[in-house]
Regions:
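Short, small/acidic-rich helices and loops at N termini and domain boundaries
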Residues: 1-84
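Glycine-biased, small-residue-rich flexible motifs in mid-sequence functional cores and linkers
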Residues: 2-18, 76, 81-294
Length: 294
């Protein structure tokens, strides 16, 4: 990884030190994404290393690197809020992520026309077919397809983008060293080596706490995925789907939110009409997407 970057208002910074400091902050009791965001909002000109003991930061950095090495990861990168190479779009999030890990080609995160394709893990046969048709059209029109590497719609979106010769980004809810679901191990490796995998999840916190608490990182990544893209397209989702967290985030962040027409025809759910009233765009044909993203 690159060991230095430039802080917008300060001298060059040590990325490994900042990574360790950030990880150390996350190991404090009761730390949450919201509390981390509030901490840096109240210290806008400070780096993670300004807020912790430096010996603790170095120790945490060593632990992360050792953990990654044990998982076969050597060439990873980070992006730190406040540096020139941090994605400006992520600052639109209600609680901007202070540090991101990534594997692969970061240039994809800056490519034009990034669109998230998301939906249920228990996708129907019709929903799977709609996902494939949608992604093929997006790739045909030179969009970069972003999704969360979950089962169902996400997996199909990534696979179809690759098969169609397009670009894809996975924004995952685990550290870059972990795979969830396990069935996607090969797909995650392929995206990491040929495209881009992004994670906001603190490595040591995830390693040291139980799955019950680690599940809370998944909805947070949906907010980041929305901020990183110019639009979110929902293929299929239930009334309680985590996809709706991303739907709300998209509207809050000033992003376009598209909902496929088939969702409005499903009498078992009411969320499509609710979000249409809030500003979401109903998609009856692919041109509805193109017209609104010109």
């Amino acid at each position: 990884m690159s060991t230095t970057s430039t802080f917008l208002t300060r001298k060059p910074v040590d990325n490994l030190l900042e990574m360790g400091a950030y990880e150390h902050l996350w190991q404090q009791p009761s730390t949450t994404t919201k509390r981390i965001a509030e901490l840096f909002e109240s210290h806008p000109d400070q780096l993670p290393s300004d807020l912790v003991d430096l010996s603790a930061a170095h120790e945490s950095a060593r632990e992360v690197i050792e953990h990654f090495a044990g998982r076969g990861i050597k060439n990873f990168g980070i992006r730190l809020n406040g540096t020139a190479d941090y994605p400006g779009r992520l600052r639109d999030a209600k609680e901007p992520i202070e540090l991101l890990y990534f594997l692969g080609s970061w240039e994809l995160a800056e490519a034009p026309r990034r669109v998230a394709v998301v939906g249920t893990r228990q996708v129907s046969a019709e929903g799977a077919a709609r996902t494939r048709r949608l992604v093929k059209e997006l790739i045909k029109h030179d969009f970069t397809v972003v999704s969360g590497l979950a089962q169902g719609v996400d997996t199909i979106a990534h696979q179809t983008a690759i098969e169609a010769g397009g670009r894809t980004i996975a924004v995952i809810g685990t550290p870059i060293s972990e795979v969830y679901p396990k069935e996607n191990a090969s797909l995650q490796r392929q995206i990491a080596s040929q495209y881009l995998v992004v994670s906001q999840v603190p490595v040591l916190r995830y390693k040291n706490q139980t799955p019950k608490w680690n599940r809370l990182f998944f909805p947070e990544r949906n907010k980041t995925m929305s901020a990183l893209t110019e639009a979110t397209i929902i293929v299929e989702a239930s009334e309680t789907s985590g996809t709706l967290i991303q739907a709300k985030a998209a509207l809050d962040q000033g992003r376009k939110l598209f909902i496929l027409e088939s969702n409005f025809s499903n009498t078992a759910i009411t969320w499509p009409a609710k979000y249409e009233k809030l500003g979401a765009i109903r998609v009856r044909e692919f041109d509805d997407i193109l017209r609104n993203l010109e």
